[in-house]
């Protein structure tokens, strides 16, 4: 029993809306209460009740090295002693920016911000300022943070909680957001045929991670690049999840497609609040103070996040991505076989160190097919795995994550737990 977690959740609901500071954490999508975490190390979470869980959420993506990696924590400890915020430039901003520019093919310059949402909203403003256009092409079920233009048919917590429409967002705002199904290039072509002269940008999760994991079909990203080139629009890759995860150079390196703008977050802060957006030099130089597109932030480039980011990227630059991907592929193959053996419909999408268990017989290639998965089966699976010490995302519309800290024994423990699940 998670008694202390339950007590804290009850108290939190009196003080914090829904008892949480981000909706999906409330575990409403899986008919459960949240666990309150006391500490984390490696692949493990430790709750306030003294329970230990093997973590396959990784703080929703940042912890690719696992929790409390010694090089990252040492860097943060050293940074704390130098001051937590200056409101002025620091050397580590330059160092981290150089590492990002060196790693990502589509980034000549980068601006640090404080979250993925801030990165995407700033990138959209820049795209509109650069092109002089207003409309945005977005994909149904993709999630780009909670800024108003992105909440039309969004994934992640919006999908988990089945929130209808966009309450609080003016219709005039989302009117400029044009929607297409993910992986449907023909639908995007139709949008450009109707609105091509008004479209400032396409924004896309190069690998969708917020409708569950959905990889791009062959030719999809290439087609988006071609359409943008033909119509003078910008291609924005949202790499908040995929950046430094699907390869050290992100999805753009893995798939060989160079976007005009890239948004980042999660991993580049090593677990501290951070975001960034970058792109071609001529576009990025339109940002104030060298250009007329305004964006600012009191804590942008703060020394703690910069130190954590530098240490994280240093370790990742010498990490065995191919080895981790091979281990995850073998693990997922066995997990799928175990679940299919129980007589339930199941498909597991996987790419790099991410995967999602979809309880459906149909291929999942977009949000519509993701919604065919049986939510009740996922809830049962989640509860039974959690009861055995396996911590999965409390939503069928999120990706599970495997870190470099996960051992073969950790993966075997999840497989053993899956064998004990009944439906």
From Swiss-Prot:
PANTHER family xrefs: GLUTAMATE-1-SEMIALDEHYDE 2,1-AMINOMUTASE (PTHR43713), GLUTAMATE-1-SEMIALDEHYDE 2,1-AMINOMUTASE 1, CHLOROPLASTIC-RELATED (PTHR43713:SF3)
UniProt key word ATP-binding: no
Cofactor(s) the protein requires to work: pyridoxal 5'-phosphate
Enzyme type, top EC level: isomerase
Biological process per Gene Ontology, one example term: protoporphyrinogen IX biosynthetic process
Family, as annotated: Belongs to the class-III pyridoxal-phosphate-dependent aminotransferase family. HemL subfamily.
Keyword presence, Glycoprotein: no
One GO molecular-function entry: glutamate-1-semialdehyde 2,1-aminomutase activity
Gene that produces this protein: hemL
Pfam families in the record: Aminotran_3
CC annotations in GO: cytoplasm
Catalytic activities: (S)-4-amino-5-oxopentanoate = 5-aminolevulinate
Transmembrane regions: none
Places the protein is found: Cytoplasm
Pathway: Porphyrin-containing compound metabolism; protoporphyrin-IX biosynthesis; 5-aminolevulinate from L-glutamyl-tRNA(Glu): step 2/2
Keywords carried by this UniProt record: Cytoplasm, Isomerase, Porphyrin biosynthesis, Pyridoxal phosphate
SUPFAM superfamilies (UniProt xref): PLP-dependent transferases
Subunit structure: Homodimer.
EC number: 5.4.3.8
Modified residues (N6-(pyridoxal phosphate)lysine): 266
Name of the molecule in the record: Glutamate-1-semialdehyde 2,1-aminomutase
């Amino acid at each position: 029993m998670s008694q202390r977690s339950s007590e804290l959740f009850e108290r939190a609901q009196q003080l914090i809306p829904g008892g949480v500071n981000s909706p999906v954490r409330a575990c409403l999508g899986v008919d459960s209460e949240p666990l309150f975490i006391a500490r984390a190390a490696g692949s493990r979470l430790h709750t306030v009740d003294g329970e230990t869980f093997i973590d396959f959420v990784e703080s929703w993506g940042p912890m690719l090295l696992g929790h409390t990696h010694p090089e990252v924590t040492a860097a943060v400890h050293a940074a704390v002693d130098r001051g937590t915020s200056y409101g002025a430039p620091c050397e580590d901003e330059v160092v981290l920016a150089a590492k990002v520019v060196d790693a990502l093919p589509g980034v000549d310059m980068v601006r640090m911000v404080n979250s993925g949402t801030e990165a995407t909203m700033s990138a959209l403003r820049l795209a509109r300022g650069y092109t002089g256009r207003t409309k945005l092409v977005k994909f149904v079920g993709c999630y780009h943070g909670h800024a108003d233009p992105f909440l039309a048919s969004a994934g992640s917590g919006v999908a988990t909680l089945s929130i209808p429409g966009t309450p609080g967002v003016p219709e005039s705002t989302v009117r400029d957001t044009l929607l297409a199904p993910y992986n449907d290039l023909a639908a995007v072509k139709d949008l450009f045929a109707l609105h091509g002269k008004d479209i400032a940008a396409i924004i896309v999760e190069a690998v969708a991670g917020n409708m569950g994991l959905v990889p791009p079909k062959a030719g999809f990203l290439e087609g988006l690049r071609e359409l943008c080139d033909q119509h003078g629009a910008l291609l924005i890759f949202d790499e908040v999840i995929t950046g430094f995860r699907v390869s050290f150079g992100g999805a753009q390196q893995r798939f060989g497609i160079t976007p005009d703008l890239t948004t980042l977050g999660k991993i580049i802060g090593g677990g501290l609040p951070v975001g960034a957006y970058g792109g071609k030099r001529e576009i990025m130089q339109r940002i104030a103070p060298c250009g007329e597109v305004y964006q600012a932030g009191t804590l942008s480039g703060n020394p703690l996040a910069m130190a954590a980011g530098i240490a994280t990227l240093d370790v990742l630059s010498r990490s065995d991505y191919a080895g981790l991907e091979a281990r995850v592929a073998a693990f997922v193959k066995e997990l799928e076989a175990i679940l299919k053996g129980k007589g339930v419909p199941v498909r597991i999408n996987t790419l790099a160190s991410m995967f999602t268990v979809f309880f459906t017989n149909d291929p999942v290639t977009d949000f519509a097919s993701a919604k065919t998965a049986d939510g009740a089966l996922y809830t049962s699976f989640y509860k039974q795995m959690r009861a055995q010490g396996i911590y999965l995302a409390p939503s069928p519309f999120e990706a599970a994550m495997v870190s470099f800290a996960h051992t073969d024994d950790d993966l075997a423990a999840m497989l053993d737990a899956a064998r004990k699940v009944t439906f």
